[in-house]
């Protein structure tokens, strides 16, 4: 009976939290038509978003459009949403590394797509679409790293802020270039940047639009460290090793840890406490907890 009740509680809580993570920030009341913007984005093809899920519970999400420094085309934006949905359903997942192909991270949006949707409504729809996707990415119950090689520019810089941690390689750079394009971040990058490094430092980075090298990023708290390797294979192996210190243990427990931290960051205190209680209930008396209690008795 106890096992049945635990499983029922776990499934109910899991379903409710999954629904909350997928909830759109915007709807028709905001003049947001997701199907319309999907049709528009579908017109701008090129590149891909590749996902490999390893037996260790680590996912590798690769931006692949090396001809344009891994800039997001319209179809890549759509594929990113699909990959996030896939990761939301990955019950064995523990961690995620986001990287770019060809020793560079991401140069933002494909300018051909930007020019074609330069009217206000299309731009707003694209903004809302990417905010939805990157918010869901940030809320994944996986511990995530942006592995920054080469350049992370504009929207690429914004993408790094949707990850829990950032690791940089020698000679890499994060740069919020939006001001030089007559813009501000539109994919949620400004709001997330303020939460990562504070409002004063965020204002400096956005208003000066200067590049941030690994040393300064570490000083600002924008990066957790600089890897020793700058090549694609070596840096990925280093990132895996770095992430492993946080992902040791059962996937259910790692995901629970991420969920309570996300709740504490985003929700008012009372709501965060209720979420913590619900998540606690999914692991209390669960397999990992019972195994740990058995080990302690020996």
From Swiss-Prot:
Keyword Lyase part of the UniProt annotation: yes
Keyword hit for Lyase: yes
Catalytic activity: (2S)-ethylmalonyl-CoA + H(+) = butanoyl-CoA + CO2; (S)-methylmalonyl-CoA + H(+) = propanoyl-CoA + CO2; (2R)-ethylmalonyl-CoA + H(+) = butanoyl-CoA + CO2
Keyword terms of this UniProt record: Cytoplasm, Lyase
Origin: domain of life: Eukaryota
One GO cellular component, as annotated: cytosol
GO BP terms, alphabetized: fatty acid beta-oxidation
Enzyme class: lyase
CDD domains: crotonase-like
Subcellular location: Cytoplasm, Cytosol
UniProt xrefs under Pfam families: ECH_1
One term of GO molecular function: methyl/ethyl malonyl-CoA decarboxylase activity
Enzyme Commission identifier(s): 4.1.1.94
Family as reported in the entry's similarity comment: Belongs to the enoyl-CoA hydratase/isomerase family.
Function, as annotated: Decarboxylates ethylmalonyl-CoA, a potentially toxic metabolite, to form butyryl-CoA, suggesting it might be involved in metabolite proofreading. Acts preferentially on (S)-ethylmalonyl-CoA but also has some activity on the (R)-isomer. Also has methylmalonyl-CoA decarboxylase activity at lower level.
Protein name, UniProt field: Ethylmalonyl-CoA decarboxylase
Organism whose genome encodes this protein: Gallus gallus
Lineage: Eukaryota, Metazoa, Chordata, Craniata, Vertebrata
Gene it is expressed from: ECHDC1
């Amino acid at each position: 009976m106890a096992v049945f009740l635990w499983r029922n509680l776990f499934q109910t809580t899991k379903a409710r939290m999954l629904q909350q993570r997928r909830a759109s920030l915007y709807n028709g009341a905001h003049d947001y038509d997701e199907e319309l913007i999907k049709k528009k984005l579908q017109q701008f093809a090129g590149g891909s978003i590749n996902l490999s899920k390893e037996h260790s519970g680590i996912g590798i999400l690769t931006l692949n459009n090396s001809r344009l420094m891994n800039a997001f085309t319209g179809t890549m934006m759509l594929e990113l949403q699909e990959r996030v949905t896939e990761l939301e359903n990955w019950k064995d997942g523990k961690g995620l590394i986001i990287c770019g192909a060809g020793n560079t991270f991401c140069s933002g949006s494909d300018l051909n797509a930007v020019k074609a949707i330069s009217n206000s409504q299309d731009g707003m729809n694209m903004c809302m679409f990417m905010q939805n996707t990157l918010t869901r990415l940030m809320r994944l119950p996986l511990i995530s790293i942006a592995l920054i090689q080469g350049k992370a520019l504009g929207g690429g810089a914004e993408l790094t802020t949707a990850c829990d941690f950032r690791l940089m390689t020698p000679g890499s750079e994060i740069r919020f270039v939006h001001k030089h394009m007559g813009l501000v971040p539109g994919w949620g990058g400004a709001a997330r940047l303020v939460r990562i490094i504070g409002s004063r430092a965020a204002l400096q980075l956005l208003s000066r639009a200067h590049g941030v090298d690994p040393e300064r990023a570490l000083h600002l708290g924008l990066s957790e460290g600089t890897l020793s390797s700058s090549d694609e294979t070596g840096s990925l192996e280093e990132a895996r090793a770095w992430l492993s210190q946080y992902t040791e243990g059962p996937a259910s427990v790692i995901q629970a840890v991420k969920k309570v931290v996300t709740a504490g960051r985003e929700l008012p205190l009372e709501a965060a406490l209720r979420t913590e209680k619900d998540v606690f209930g999914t692991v209390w008396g669960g397999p990992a907890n019972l195994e740990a209690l058995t080990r302690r008795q020996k």
